[in-house]
C-alpha cells in the first residue's frame, strides 16, 4: 500500500453521460483489527406536486428571517430500509392511501412483462432464523406461506395472525439497478421480478397504527407523504447522498483492484438499465431471484452499490498502517475529495457532527454476535469515513466524527448525554447502532421504533428544544414496494418513497405535508437556514426535475409553521 492518496480528477460533477449488505458486526471488526403510474388519484398527486412546493404564504425573505430566528439546531435521525407503505400505508390524511389504489395498477409483472397470476414464494422464508418474541417462537420457512394473491398484503404468520413488529424478517435486496427496474418508469410493477425475496416485497405492517410509536409522533407533528430516497438503490449510496447529494467516484477504476465490480449493461435492454444476468439466472420470478453479474460501479466508475471505506472501521484493514483499510481490496473505495455538507458548514463556521452508534466500540474492536439484540455496526453507514478530510489523525475527524455510544441510557449513549446537557452542535446527524436501526435481516421494527421514541423524548426535554428541528427518516426503502411513482429526476434518482417525520416546536401539528421532497431536501434546509453554498448535486437534481414538469424538490419549510 502507498501513503499517497489517489487523485480523483473529479472536480466537475457530471451526472448525465449514461443512462441511468453487507453488514459488519463488531466482532468482525475485532477480527480485522486483531488480524407510478398508479391509479388516477396517484396520477393527480403527481400532477399537483408543483402546487405544494412552497408550503407557506410567507415571502422567501420572511421565511429566511423566520428560520434564523426560530431554528438554531437541526437533528437528523437516519434509520434504515423501510418504504413508506411498509410502515404508513393508510395513515390518516395521506394524499393517496394504499386502500384507495386501483388493484389493477399494483399488479406485479414477471421479467418478461407478463402479469403474474400469483406472487412467488418468499424465498428462504419470511423468518429464516428462529427467534422468540412476546414469549412465542417464530420460524417461518419458504414453504409455510405460498400462493399469495398478486397484491400488497399485511404481514402475517402462516396461521393468519399479524406478524409482530419485534420479529426480524429476512433481508431484501436493495440495490441501484434493481430499484430502477422495480420502479419501471413509475409503474412500480417490477418489485417482485427484480427483488430477491419473492412475495415479501409487497408486505406491510397492518397494525402500525396501534403499535408504532412513530405513528404517534407523526400524528402530533408532520408526516411527509411525498418524500423520496435520494438515489435508486441501497444504504451505501444513499448515505453518501445525505451528505453530498451525489455518489462517490473511483477514477481509473478499470485499472484498479475494483475493476471486477464495474457493471456490464445488457445491450439488449432498450433502457440501458439492466446489468447482464449470470448464466443460469432464472427466467421467471416464479422460479427464483434474478442474478446479476457485477454491478458495484457504473461503467463510468461511480460507486452505486456497497463499497467499504478507506479507513477503519472497515472489513479488511492494512496491517502495516493502523487505522487504514486495505486499499488493495476490491471492495475498498479510495478516499473521496469532493465537497460535502460538512465542508460547507465548516467553511461558514457552523458547528456540526456525525454521531454513530457503536463507533467507539467498533474502533476498539468490541465483539458481539450478529443478530438483533446485539450492537451490530455497519461500516458503509458511515459516509464521512470515505473522505480524505476525515482521515485518521486529522483534526476534522476528531471534531466531527463522534461516538454516539450504545443503548438508550445517557450513561452509555453519548448522544443522549449531549442532548441532556444542551451540548448539541448546530447540525447533528445520528446513525443508530445496527440492531436499533430497523434494517430487515438484523434489526426489527419494534426495537428501532422504541429507540426513535427514546431519542425524541430526550430531544423534547433538552434545553435546546425550543429552537430545534428534528428530521426522522430512512436511508432507503430496503427493497420494500411502494405505490407512489417517484418524480423524474437525474440519472441517480429520486428513488422509492420513504417515511419522513418532521418534529419541532415549529412543525405544523397533526399535519400531513404533500410537498415533494427527497433526501437532498435535508441539505436544502440546512443550506437555506445557514446561507451555505449549495452543493453541485443539489443543483443538478433541481435542474433535472424542473426540466421534466416544473417540479422542484422542497426544502422542508412546507412542514413548518413560521408565521
Predicted ranges, named:
Residues 2-20, 24-563:
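N-terminal pro-sequences and low-complexity stem/linker regions of secreted or lumenal proteins
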Amino acid at each position: 500500500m502507498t501513503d499517497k492518496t489517489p487523485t480523483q480528477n473529479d472536480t466537475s460533477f457530471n451526472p448525465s453521460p449514461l443512462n441511468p449488505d453487507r453488514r459488519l458486526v463488531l466482532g468482525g471488526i475485532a477480527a480485522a483489527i486483531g488480524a407510478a403510474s398508479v391509479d388516477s388519484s396517484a396520477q393527480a398527486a403527481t400532477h399537483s406536486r408543483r402546487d405544494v412546493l412552497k408550503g407557506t404564504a410567507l415571502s422567501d425573505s420572511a421565511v429566511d428571517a423566520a428560520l434564523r430566528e426560530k431554528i438554531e439546531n437541526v437533528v437528523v435521525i437516519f434509520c434504515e430500509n423501510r418504504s413508506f407503505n411498509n410502515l404508513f400505508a393508510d395513515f390518516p390524511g395521506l394524499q393517496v392511501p394504499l386502500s384507495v389504489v386501483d388493484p389493477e395498477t399494483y399488479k406485479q409483472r414477471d421479467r418478461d412483462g407478463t402479469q403474474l397470476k400469483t406472487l412467488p414464494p418468499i424465498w428462504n422464508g419470511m423468518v429464516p432464523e428462529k427467534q422468540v418474541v412476546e414469549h412465542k417462537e417464530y420460524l417461518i420457512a419458504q414453504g409455510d406461506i405460498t400462493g399469495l394473491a398478486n397484491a400488497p398484503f399485511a404481514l402475517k404468520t402462516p396461521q393468519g395472525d399479524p406478524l409482530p413488529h419485534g420479529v426480524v424478517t429476512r433481508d431484501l435486496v436493495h440495490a441501484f439497478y434493481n430499484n430502477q427496474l422495480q420502479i419501471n418508469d413509475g409503474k412500480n410493477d417490477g418489485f417482485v421480478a427484480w427483488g430477491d425475496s419473492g412475495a415479501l416485497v409487497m408486505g406491510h405492517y397492518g397494525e402500525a397504527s396501534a403499535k408504532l410509536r412513530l405513528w404517534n409522533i407523526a400524528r402530533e407533528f408532520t408526516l411527509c407523504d411525498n418524500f423520496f430516497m435520494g438515489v435508486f438503490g441501497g444504504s451505501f449510496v444513499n448515505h453518501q447522498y445525505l451528505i453530498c447529494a451525489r455518489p462517490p467516484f473511483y477514477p481509473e477504476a478499470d485499472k484498479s483492484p475494483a475493476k471486477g465490480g464495474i457493471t456490464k449493461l445488457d445491450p439488449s435492454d432498450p433502457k440501458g438499465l439492466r446489468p447482464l444476468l449470470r448464466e443460469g439466472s432464472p427466467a421467471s420470478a416464479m422460479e427464483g431471484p434474478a442474478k446479476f453479474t457485477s454491478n458495484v460501479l457504473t461503467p463510468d466508475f461511480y460507486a452505486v452499490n456497497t463499497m467499504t471505506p478507506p479507513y477503519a472501521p472497515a472489513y479488511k484493514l492494512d496491517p502495516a498502517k493502523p487505522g487504514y483499510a486495505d486499499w488493495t481490496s476490491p471492495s475498498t473505495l479510495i478516499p473521496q475529495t469532493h465537497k460535502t455538507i460538512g465542508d460547507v458548514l465548516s467553511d461558514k463556521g457552523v458547528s456540526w457532527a456525525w454521531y454513530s452508534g457503536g463507533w467507539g466500540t467498533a474502533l476498539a474492536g468490541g465483539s458481539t454476535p450478529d443478530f438483533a439484540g446485539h450492537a451490530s455496526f455497519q461500516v458503509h453507514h458511515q459516509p464521512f469515513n470515505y473522505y480524505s478530510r476525515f482521515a485518521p489523525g486529522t483534526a476534522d475527524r476528531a471534531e466531527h466524527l463522534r461516538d454516539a455510544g450504545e443503548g438508550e441510557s445517557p450513561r452509555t449513549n453519548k448522544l443522549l448525554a449531549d442532548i441532556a446537557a444542551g451540548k448539541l452542535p448546530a447540525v447533528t446527524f445520528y446513525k443508530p447502532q445496527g440492531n436499533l436501526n430497523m434494517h430487515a435481516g438484523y434489526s426489527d421494527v419494534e426495537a428501532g421504533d422504541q429507540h426513535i421514541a427514546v431519542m425524541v423524548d430526550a430531544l423534547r426535554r433538552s434545553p435546546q428544544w425550543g429552537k430545534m428541528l428534528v428530521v426522522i427518516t430512512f436511508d432507503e426503502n430496503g427493497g420494500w414496494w411502494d405505490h407512489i411513482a417517484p418524480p423524474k429526476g437525474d440519472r441517480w434518482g429520486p428513488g422509492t418513497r420513504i417515511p419522513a417525520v418532521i418534529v419541532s416546536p415549529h412543525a405544523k401539528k397533526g399535519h400531513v405535508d404533500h410537498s415533494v421532497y427527497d433526501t437532498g431536501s435535508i441539505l436544502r434546509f440546512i443550506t437555506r437556514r445557514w446561507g451555505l453554498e449549495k452543493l453541485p448535486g443539489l443543483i443538478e437534481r433541481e435542474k433535472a426535475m424542473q426540466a421534466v414538469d416544473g417540479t422542484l424538490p422542497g426544502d422542508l419549510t412546507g412542514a413548518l409553521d413560521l408565521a
